[in-house]
Structure formats: C-alpha cells, structure tokens
C-alpha cells in the first residue's frame, strides 16, 4: 500500500473568511475552523486509488473532509473511510495550490472551533463517480441546495490540477480536467507571496546599505567616544610614561579648572569622582589634605588635587576637570577627515596631559607635603568623607564657628581616618567634643576604633599643633602604593563608602607599629592604629572615660572589642579585661572559660571513667604477661624493659 503525504503551513491560511462560505444545511459546520481548512492535511492514497484526507495539526493525523470537492462527488455512505477519486488528489498536488481549498468550511458532524477532527465518513464517493471523474452534475444528495456563492465557487474550482500526475505517484486515473483555472489562482498567490518577500528583502538590504555608510562615513563619531577610555587608560599608564614637558600647561589648566564647577557636591554615590588621588600622601594632619586611602580602586591615578585651593571644589576636579580638558582637546568634530593629523596630535596631547596628571599627582603629593599653599578647610564640598584634609589647621582657628561646625560635619567623618591611613602618629591638643554636633551618630562602624581619638581631637580641635617635618619625597611616593594595598575594595552599598574611606582593619597591623612610648605619650592619637585602641584601652586607665557616651560610640566600642579582642588579649592581657566593659570571647578563650569544669559534666563521672580505664589497662597487662609466660618468655625481663601493669 503506497501513500502520499503533503505537509502544509497553517499560517498561510486566510483567516478572514466570509462566514457565508460553508455548507448551509450541515449544522455542525463551524466558520471558526476556516483557518484549519487550508489544506493542512496529509493525503494518503491506497493502492486501489482511494484517498484518505487526514488533517494534520502538529502531526496528529485525523480523518478530514476535502473542502473543495464538488457536490456531485459527495455521497453519504456507510461509516467507511472517505474514498476520493484521483481528481480530488489532483486538487492537493502541491502546497502552492492549496489556497483555493481554504475557502470552504469543514464538513462533518465533528467539526468545531476547538477541534478540526472532521470525520470524512460523512463524505464518500460512489464507485460510479470514481469511474466518471469528468461528470459535472451537482446533485446535492437529497440535502438542501447550496448557496449560489458556494455553488459558483465550486464551479469555478477545478478538481484536476495539472500538477497532480507529477506529484502523485500512486493515483490510478489521472483526470483530464482543464487545469488553467486552478493553476492560475495558486500561481497568482505564489507570485504575490514572492513579490512581498522580494520587497521585504529589498527593504532589509536597503536598510543595511544605509546603515553601513552611516557607520563608515563619520569616523570621528567613533573616535570621540573612544577618546575618553583611551585617555583614561592613558591616565592609568601615566605613572610609567613620562611626558614632563606637557605638564606645565596642565597645571595652568588645572588652576583654571577649579572654577569649572563651584559649589558643593553631595552625591553620596559618586565616590569615584570625589575621592582624592592615591598620590596625596600627606603624613601630617597640619599639612595640606592628608591622603585618605579611601580612594576607590577605579580612581587610583586621578590628577593630584594639590593644584586646587580651598575655594576649589576639588572633588569636582577629577571628572569635571577631565571632561573640561576633553572638551578642549578633542578635535573639532566637523573636520575629522580634513585634519586627521591634527586630530591625532590632539589625541596625543590629551593623552600626554592625562599622563601628566599622574606625574603631577606624584609631584604634587610632595608639593602638598612641602607647601602649605592649600589648607583644605572643607569649603571644597560638604561631602568630604574621603576628600578634605579633615584636620584642623590654623585656618580653622581663623574661621568662624559656622565654618568650624561645617568642617566638623565634613571632615570629622574622616578626621580619624587620615592619620590612621597614613600610619603616622599625630599629636593633638585638647579639643571640644564633636560628638555633640551629631557627627558621631553618622560615622560608620568600621571607623569605630577612632571614636576615642575623635573625642580627643574634638576636645582640642582648635589648638593647632605644628606638623612634624614633611617626609622625604621618596617615602611620599612609595606610600601611595602601600596605602592602596591597605585599602579594602569599595563596598557595594553607598553606606560602605565610609568603610572604604577608612580601611581601619587593614591598617591595624602596620599602624599598630608605633612604640608603646608613642602610644603612652600620645594617647589621643589612638586613631593611628586600630590595634592600639585595645592596647590603649588596656594600658591607660583614662580611656574608658575618654570614650564618647553616644550610642554610636558604644556600638563602635563593641565592634572594636569584637574585632580587636585578640589584640587586646595580646597587648593588654588580663589588665585589659578589667578596663573593658564588654569582652567578646572567642574559641581561643576556651582554656580560660573552661578551667575547673569537668568536661564530662561531673567529677564523679570523671573519676568513675578514670577508674574503669585503669582496670582495663591492668587486665590487659596481666593478660599480656600471662601470654608471655605461657610462651616461655622471661616475664621479669619484660617488666625490667618497662612493661607496667
């Protein structure tokens, strides 16, 4: 038995079908299945020429009716499989010609909008009509007459496609019906589809062609967006690349740029723009802007802020200054092609300038240390967690109380951090309490080790101590790298900004290096190390009193004790425990906590278990001696060798 199957595409069907185009007297017909009528069937041919039309939806073959069959070929028969003459098969010879079949609706009692399982048993062909495929009599088999629209449509449809003999291999009787009427419609349909496809492809090609010149024609558009990353990379490389001759103009520009943006920037999430360069390594608070190692990793080699005076909002220096330079230096956009060489020169100059930013950063780190031209008093911006010098300078004394309070707000956040980060001991006089200003409440816990230091600083805020002599430039240059190494990565949350500003935990090890003499001599500078907090707390009895009574200080004290409990134990020993109100024990303290406690839970149980163990050992030794004696060994010699019962 040979059969022939034809796949179809259901989406090609015209779903907007005239509802009148269905068999009128069959009440089960549904117009909603019009889209299923598009020849989405498998047509199976038996060896004797019978055709089984089966609907295939996702390859679920079910018997279905052939919608385009003339009524002369529709006969109600018994419940056998619908047999169709080869003329019907010629109507379904090719997928391109299925369009004319899609107009008629489902026939059969099982047709419904939800299911296209049409029982073709309703449709059978008599043997007489199989023998006479060419007859065109339209008797409706006792049923009601068809509508004129259906009748005219069926008359216009030829059941004998010329392509049927070519595509069907097992049909017995090819039909000689005129092929033109059917062939024209599918051809027109195919031509329409092909034309629309061509148009669509042409439009796509045109769009692509238009896009290509748009990309190629203005190379400057690409060059300008690429400049900024290149320059940023240049800034990163500037430390290794020395283009000193360009640096002086950069200084001039930097001096001019502070006026690029005036005012204060309170953006809490824009740390990278506000952080000072890592190169600013002023080891002494009295000098300009002690370096806050707070700088985020991405801003490592920003141009040095030492160029900026107090009135400059230097936190804007990094990005506004760079953008300002970029605006100055990028080549004029209208002439990318006419002046390629000029464009390259400008790019090179721009890169050199950024490189000189880095070089100047290093030079100005030293200049800041040596020159007091810049006393940052916090006017550069209120958001100074990592930016201002933060230390009270002689200018602070001249400033009014409002300025001083502002400086407290801006600088006290990192007041402790600068000395800590530089790892240098500082001498401070007595300072008024800043905690009353509400500062301590807002300070992050990571800085907790500095609370007493802040208290001491605030007590002596306006008594300015001259800074020690500046550190040599070689040391100043080396320090930024070391400080960066101690900087923790910037936290994801904005609140952790302060944590990144003061890597207290990282600094504890190296910053605890100051000798006990320094700590005792300068107990107020306890900010110099996180570990020294515990040591000072244990060594000097005044420390508990010096701690601020604010809730934040309590929280900090607790966190300091937790983190520095080991250092407190090592530095202060038991004396520190007496001076500490809260102690967080660790597993290492088990020997202290568990002394005098029987692990088994009771002394009686412990004694009983020890006695049982001794009995076992005694029995084993006796058994061993008996075994040796039984073997003929010298028991006395065995005992002399150290064998014990």
From Swiss-Prot:
Q: Which UniProt keywords apply?
A: Activator, Conidiation, Sporulation, Transcription, Transcription regulation
Q: Disordered: where is this region?
A: 158-187, 201-249, 284-376, 461-578, 596-618
Description of the deletion phenotype = Produces fewer branches per conidiophore and thus has significantly lower conidial yields.
Which factors induce or repress this protein, as stated in its UniProt record?
A: Expression remains constant during conidiation. Expression is positively regulated by BrlA and AbaA.
The UniProt regions of compositional bias labelled Polar residues, in chain numbering, are: 240-249, 509-518, 562-572
At the top level of its lineage, which domain of life is listed? Eukaryota
Q: Name one GO biological process term.
A: conidium formation
Query: Quick check: keyword Secreted in the entry?
Result: no
The protein, known as: Developmental regulatory protein wetA
According to its UniProt record, which protein family does this protein belong to? Answer: Belongs to the wetA family.
Q: What does this protein do?
A: BrlA, abaA and wetA are pivotal regulators of conidiophore development and conidium maturation. They act individually and together to regulate their own expression and that of numerous other sporulation-specific genes. BrlA, abaA and wetA act together to positively regulate the expression of the Pks1 gene cluster that mediates the biosynthesis of an anthraquinone derivative pigment that contributes to conidial pigmentation that provides protection from UV radiation, heat and cold stress.
Q: Where is the composition biased (Basic residues)?
A: 315-326, 351-361
């Amino acid at each position: 038995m040979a059969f022939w199957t034809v796949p179809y595409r259901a989406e090609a069907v015209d779903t907007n079908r005239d509802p009148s185009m269905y068999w009128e007297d069959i009440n089960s017909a549904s117009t909603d299945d019009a889209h299923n009528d598009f020849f989405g069937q498998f047509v199976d041919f038996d060896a004797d020429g019978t055709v089984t039309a089966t609907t295939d939806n996702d390859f679920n073959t079910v018997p279905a009716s052939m919608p385009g069959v003339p009524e002369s070929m529709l006969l109600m028969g018994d419940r056998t499989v619908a047999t169709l003459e080869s003329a019907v098969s010629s109507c379904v010879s090719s997928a391109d010609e299925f369009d004319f079949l899609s107009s008629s609706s489902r026939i059969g009692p099982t047709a419904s909008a939800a299911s296209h399982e049409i029982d073709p048993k309703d449709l059978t062909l008599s043997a007489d009509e199989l023998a006479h495929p060419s007859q065109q009599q339209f008797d409706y088999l006792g049923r009601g007459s068809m509508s004129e629209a259906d009748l005219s449509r069926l008359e216009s449809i030829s059941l004998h496609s010329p392509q049927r003999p070519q595509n069907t291999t097992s049909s017995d009787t090819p039909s000689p019906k005129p092929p033109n009427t059917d062939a024209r419609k599918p051809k027109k349909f195919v031509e329409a589809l092909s034309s629309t496809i061509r148009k669509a492809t042409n439009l796509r090609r045109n769009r692509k062609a238009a896009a290509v010149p748009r990309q190629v024609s203005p190379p400057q558009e690409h060059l300008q967006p690429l400049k900024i990353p290149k320059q940023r990379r240049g800034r990163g490389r500037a430390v290794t690349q020395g283009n000193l001759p360009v640096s002086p103009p950069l200084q001039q520009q930097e001096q001019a740029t502070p006026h690029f943006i005036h005012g204060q920037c309170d953006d809490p999430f824009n740390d990278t723009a506000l952080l000072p360069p890592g190169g600013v390594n002023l080891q002494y608070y009295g000098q300009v802007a002690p370096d806050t190692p707070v700088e985020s990793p991405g801003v490592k080699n920003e141009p040095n802020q030492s160029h900026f005076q107090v009135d400059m909002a230097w936190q804007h220096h990094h990005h506004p200054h760079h953008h300002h330079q970029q605006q100055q230096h990028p080549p004029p956009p209208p002439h990318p092609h006419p002046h390629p060489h000029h464009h390259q020169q400008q790019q090179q100059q721009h890169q050199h300038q950024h490189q000189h930013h880095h070089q100047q950063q290093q030079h100005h780190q030293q200049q800041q240390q040596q020159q007091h031209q810049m006393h940052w008093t916090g006017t550069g911006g209120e958001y100074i967690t990592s930016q201002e010098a933060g230390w009270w300078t002689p200018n602070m004394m001249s400033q009014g109380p409002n300025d001083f309070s502002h400086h407290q707000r801006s600088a006290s956040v990192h007041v402790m951090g600068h000395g800590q980060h530089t790892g240098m001991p500082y001498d401070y006089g007595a300072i008024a309490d800043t905690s009353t200003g509400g500062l301590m409440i807002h300070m992050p816990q990571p800085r907790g080790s500095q609370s007493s230091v802040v208290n001491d600083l605030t007590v002596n805020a306006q008594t300015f101590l001259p800074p020690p002599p500046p550190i040599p430039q070689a040391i100043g240059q080396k320090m930024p790298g070391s400080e960066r190494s101690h900087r923790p990565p910037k936290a994801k949350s904005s609140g952790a900004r302060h944590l990144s500003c003061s890597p207290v935990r990282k600094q504890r090890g190296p910053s605890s290096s100051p000798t006990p003499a320094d700590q005792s001599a300068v107990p107020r500078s306890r900010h110099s190390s996180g570990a020294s907090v515990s040591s000072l707390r244990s060594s000097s009895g005044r420390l508990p009193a010096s701690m601020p009574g604010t809730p934040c200080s309590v929280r900090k004290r607790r966190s300091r004790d937790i983190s520095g409990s080991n250092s407190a134990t090592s530095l202060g020993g038991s004396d520190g425990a007496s001076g500490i109100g809260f102690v967080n024990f660790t597993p290492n303290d088990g020997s202290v906590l568990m002394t005098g406690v029987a692990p088994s839970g009771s002394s009686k149980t412990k004694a009983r278990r020890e006695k049982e163990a001794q009995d076992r050992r005694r029995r084993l030794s006796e058994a061993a001696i008996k075994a040796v004696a039984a073997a003929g060994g010298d028991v006395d010699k065995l005992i002399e060798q150290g064998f014990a019962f």
